Amino acid sequence: MQRVHAFGDDALGDLDAVGLADAIRAGWVSRADVIEAAIVRTEAVNPALGGLAYEAFQWARQTASKAGSGFFSGVPTFIKDNIDVAGQPTMRGSDAWVPRNAFDDGEFTRLYLATGPVSLGKTQLSEFGFSASAEHMRLGPVRNPWDTDYTAGASSSGSGAFVAAGVVPMAHANDGGGSIRIPASCNGLVGLKPSRGRLPLDSELRRLPVGIVVNGVLTRSVRDTAAFYREAERIWHNPKLPPVGDVTQPGRQRLRIAVVTRSVQRECSPELRELTLKSARLLEELGHRVERVAEPPVPPNFPDDFLLYWGLLAAMQVRTGRLAFGNTFDRTKLDSLTLGLDRHASRNMHRLPKAIMRLRRLRRRTADFFATYDVLLTPTVADETPRIGYLTPTDYQQVMDRLMGWVAFTPLQNVTGEPAISLPLAQSADGMPVGMMFTADFGQEAQLLELAFELEEARPWARIQIGD
């Protein structure tokens, strides 16, 4: 077992993003010293973790020398390498083409940087974000800082590893099937998947027949996540959604909470079942009304429909690769998971229209569920965090069977558009973090953040730097 972190007695200390932003504003630390400390931390842990996709250290130094605006002004961060940053390549976790530098920032990049943080570069992900573990055959795996024998989860792998290891207090992530929440669970972080439409998307994602992808952040504290959504909302607000507002403390309302430990496919592992029920007992102690429910509000054909839609997204990358990425695109360099998903879609294209129709209708079923309950509690994933190698994309069918079993709970909210947050409320017997996922009705991020503040106060998370 090797635990890797960068926490130390430098300008970053062990501050979260809000604390660091406050320290910069008060003049206790300078932007330049903070950015330099984050660069040193990156260089110290990246050889062990493999989370860095592209470094922009010199650009970060130059940016730090300017008096920036925004609440998080001067706070170091990273951006996941599947959205554009002007002047930097976007490789999407693949080496199947020679990258070109982006001409402009993507829509979310502009919003994120407008809140003030300084990006040190881009973080690694699984190829196109399709796998829940970044284990590229040539680029190498992204390892978990709690124990480098284990995966950091995916697809926001590098962001999760770097935030957990103390390189930066907050990093960009996005989620099309669990890619914020799964790394949050694996790395002991707070990971909120917002409601569909809460934050801007680049144009190609807005045109999808089912809008499953959302942007967000990974943090170590609830207040960092809450502060980000408050600041983002001041810059960009969707008038069709209720505002998140300035959530700073637990809510007073006692909630009706349904607890589910079984997905459509299977019961979660015995250990995760017990940890979930332990979290349910904590909720009862806090005065919430908790009820065991046999299964989530999901039809039995949901996993097959989601997998087919996943395959469609892979086919779009494979079949339009030269158009999207240039003439250097070489599909023979794609990993077996991407190619296997493409084949799955091609063989079952006749089923796709009805699958999309059923996915679009799923929100009706969950709306009925949330007419009875305020919140749904499940484990974030169905099994303990796997070791590196378990999800390596060598044999398509084997890795797909393993993936679908492990990520059985997270895709639902991508299809329905509802918000869900993973909180590091537990640890497995081997000492790895375990996330509990809380889902609320569409647009109810504020309710989830209030509950998260309450749980963080009642059961503070384990800290990676304690017990070295």
From Swiss-Prot:
Task: State if Hydrolase is listed as a keyword.
Answer: yes
User: Which reaction is catalysed here?
Assistant: a monocarboxylic acid amide + H2O = a monocarboxylate + NH4(+)
EC number(s) per UniProt?
A: 3.5.1.4
Question: Which InterPro entries does the record cross-reference, listed alphabetically?
Answer: Amidase, Amidase_CS, Amidase_dom, AS_sf
Q: Which residues form the active site?
A: 80, 155, 179
Single Gene Ontology MF annotation = amidase activity
Q: Organism's domain of life?
A: Bacteria
- Keywords recorded for this protein, A-Z: Hydrolase
The record's similarity note reads: Belongs to the amidase family.
Its protein name is Putative amidase AmiC
Chain's gene name: amiC
